[in-house]
Amino acid sequence: MEITSTSNSRVKEWKKLNTKKGRKKQNKYILDGLHLVKEALKANKKVEELLITSKFEHLNEIEISDETKVIMISEEVSKSISETQTPQGIFGIVSIEEKKTTYPQRDVGAWLMLDGVQDPGNIGTMVRTADAAGFSGVILGEGSADLYNPKVVRAMQGSQFHIKVINDNLSGWIRHFKDMKVPVF
C-alpha cells in the first residue's frame, strides 16, 4: 500500500524530522537520497524505515535488513518530506544513537574540533575532509549547527558513518588530549 496524502499522520511525523525539535522528540533523523541510505546500511546503522517512491529504480542496489520496514510513498509525499528541489525518491529514517563521552585512551589519532561553526555546508565539508585525511573523529562544540540537521547530513555525504562525529563540550576533550600529551592547536 502506498501513502499518497501529505496530510497522513506518518508523513507529518517524517516532516518533523527536518526540525531540531522533531528530531529530539522522536530521537530519529532523516537521510535523503540513495548514497546516504547505502552508506548508513553499509555501516550497519539502524535504518528503521525506508521510504521509496514507485519511480525509484535502484532498490536492487540496496541490501535491506529484515528489521527495516519498507514503505511506498507517492512523488507528492516525497517532495513534501525532502528539503531538496528534486528528491531521489528514497529516504531512510534512522535512530539517533546515544553517544556518551568516551575519550580515546591510546592511539588517539587526529581529531578536528569545531567551535561555533553554524553553517551546515561548512560542517559537512570539514567532516568529509577529516574523513578523507584519515582523522579519527570530529567534535562539534557549543554553538555549532546540529549534527542531524538535514543540510549537515547531506553535506557530510556519508562521512559520518566512517569516522566519529559528535556534539560535545570541547574543553573536556582539550583537557583530555593535553593530559595525554597530544598536541592541541
Predicted regions and their residues:
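Short acidic-hydrophobic, aromatic-tinged amphipathic segments that line or gate anion-handling sites
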Residues: 2-5, 71-74, 163-173
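RNA substrate-binding interface of SAM-dependent RNA methyltransferases
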Residues: 42, 103-185
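Short, aromatic/basic amphipathic alpha-helical patches
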Residues: 58-67
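Boundary-proximal intrinsically disordered activation/regulatory segments immediately upstream
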Residues: 1-58, 144-145
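Acidic/glycine-rich phosphate/pyrophosphate-binding loops and surrounding catalytic core
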Residues: 85, 89-90, 94-107, 144
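Glycine/small-residue-rich loop that forms an oxyanion/phosphate-binding "nest" at active or ligand-binding sites
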Residues: 69-95
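Short active-site oxyanion
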Residues: 25-28, 46-49, 67-69, 137-138, ...
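Short, hinge-like loop/turn segments at secondary-structure boundaries
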Residues: 67, 90, 155-159
